[in-house]
Amino acid sequence: MTSQGPLYIGFDLSTQQLKGLVVNSELKVVHISKFDFDADSHGFSIKKGVLTNEAEHEVFAPVALWLQALDGVLNGLRKQGLDFSRVKGISGAGQQHGSVYWGENAESLLKSLDSSKSLEEQLSGAFSHPFSPNWQDASTQKECDEFDAFLGGPEQLAEATGSKAHHRFTGPQILRMQRKYPEVYKKTARISLVSSFLASLLLGHIAPMDISDVCGMNLWDIKKGAYNEKLLGLCAGPFGVEDLKRKLGAVPEDGGLRLGKINRYFVERYGFSSDCEILPSTGDNPATILALPLRPSDAMVSLGTSTTFLMSTPNYKPDPATHFFNHPTTPGLYMFMLCYKNGGLAREHVRDAINEKSGSGASQSWESFDKIMLETPPMGQKTESGPMKMGLFFPRPEIVPNVRSGQWRFTYDPASDALTETEDGWNTPSDEARAIVESQMLSLRLRSRGLTQSPGDGLPPQPRRVYLVGGGSKNKAIAKVAGEILGGSDGVYKLDVGDNACALGAAYKAVWAIERKPGQTFEDLIGQRWREEEFIEKIADGYQKGVFEKYGKAVEGFEKMEQQVLKQEAARK
């Protein structure tokens, strides 16, 4: 006998694919359908989901491609036998910062869709501009400089909007659009983020932006809970603030708000119930922290090619090197994010040098690296009072801190606070195995201090749990050092949701929005239903008394080292 309980869909519209994932009330995944843009689309000369204009550093996607993809994913779910009439709620996740420009006829086209035709056939004319800038776009340096200067400096911009200006952020992108294509801007009735674009298709009219994703624009004043009028003025230029406000629309506070019933088109074409509710879609990073009941002060570290650090926190302490967003479901919490360009690649450089020296040459094995790292004492200190070894290892230019590619090695004496740039006493590459992982983790601890609280029992402030995801999370030696530095009173866990974190987070958000009791938080409802044993495995201890405190001293030297390198680099220019 097949179950007839409610189902929920979470979509993930990323750079290279659209995914639709279906869960039941118990959060069990029952269907997944994917549409790979390069492999499955027709009529677009895209590569890895995007088009590029090298001359102007532009990277963008044809919006019509996403229309094709939505029909493609729903067809895939139909082939799998999904009973669409059981779907009670739909939410989504979209690649952050991207913008979609709707024409004046968009609302009427969305309302009058013919279910016998595809979305692409009917909506290609709904856009004043056929492309959406991608997060990899780097065409807005001039606009970023203006945004950074406009409120007095990058610190002031970060204080107001949660981030300093970045090429990919929507505000600088809209400013460039307004100047480069004034006629297009004039004809634009509404501007959506990728997430609210997806919700708009499902709803049949333009959906509001989500309270978390709106923080990736450099336009939303996070503390005031409203658009920053001065920044809107910069962005709108001669077209005026009121016009831009109309284009952007109001932003509801409640991340679980029922925006309305599903568009009739999907009821007729796929058999959805006309009572199916559409919920706000959020950004891909906010959706990632919804893929588990991440408690305030828990930390999530993605150890991929690059390193990303996510944390849910009640403390708003913005800085130009970090990002703050409103939490996607829980008022009073913020999502803190750090993005580094150097991650796995930097660790692999050291691994390869160690393997070459030991004669295992082209081997991709981590065995020697791990063994040496675990045999090396914390901070390479030979004695308790000996000097600490620390360094920066950047095979590619870094953004946190903002510095060119290169390597810098130092020793630091915590007793006298003396820092010396030197390679004396360094046994390379062996000493670098531990030093590279320590360098990456100390940077995370430095930038997240002040956001954690004591987990109780008289422990120093630290995360309750540290969750590791991505390729590097398979490495238990790295996990051990991560726990020694970052802490984690409950330990260090490997989170394994495959590459489905964003879609799962969106689906869980839909479950919460429809099934919550009055005042029930996302963390509470999902926490009761989430089957920990299916998704996580404890792979290392976290907090260790004495070791954690020693690394606290190392953080002070690490901060000093970064400042010295930045000063030296500024002098070189």
UniProtKB/Swiss-Prot annotation:
InterPro entries: ATPase_NBD, D-XK_euk, FGGY_C, FGGY_N. The keyword Transferase applies. Its EC number is 2.7.1.17. Belongs to the FGGY kinase family. It is an enzyme of class 2 (transferase). It is found in: Cytoplasm. This is Probable D-xylulose kinase A. GO terms for molecular function: ATP binding; D-xylulokinase activity. Induction: By D-xylose, L-arabinose or L-arabitol. ATP binds at W366, G471, G472, N475. One of its GO terms (cellular component) is cytosol. Keywords: ATP-binding, Carbohydrate metabolism, Cytoplasm, Kinase, Nucleotide-binding, Transferase, Xylose metabolism. The lineage of its organism: Eukaryota, Fungi, Dikarya, Ascomycota, Pezizomycotina. CDD domains: ASKHA_NBD_FGGY_SpXK-like. Substrate binds at H97, R168, D284, N285. Highly specific D-xylulose kinase which participates in the catabolism of xylose. Xylose is a major component of hemicelluloses such as xylan. Most fungi utilize D-xylose via three enzymatic reactions, xylose reductase (XR), xylitol dehydrogenase (XDH), and xylulokinase, to form xylulose 5-phosphate, which enters pentose phosphate pathway. It catalyses: D-xylulose + ATP = D-xylulose 5-phosphate + ADP + H(+). GO terms for biological process: D-xylose metabolic process; xylulose metabolic process.
